[in-house]
């Protein structure tokens, strides 16, 4: 069974685009929550992300992974694929 991946984004955020590109290039299906200007959605994201309000915020199997730099660091360390399996 493939991992459940969720990502909170803003539509024009370059870091969000970069994180989604990594997931797309790996063929990963994910649920995207575009929260442009929606403070209620951003508050919900922050609750799940240990108070972090920056985007993107990535979750794999309901575990908070972090932002763009975090997901790319996991990829560089060879740790992302096992999480996505």
Predicted features, each with a name:
Residues 35-53, 82-83:
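Thioredoxin-like thiol-disulfide oxidoreductase module
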Residues 11, 33, 46, 68:
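Conserved short-loop catalytic and cofactor-binding motifs
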Residues 60-85:
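Non-catalytic, surface beta->alpha helical segment in thiol-disulfide oxidoreductase systems
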Residues 50-59, 69:
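Structural micro-motif
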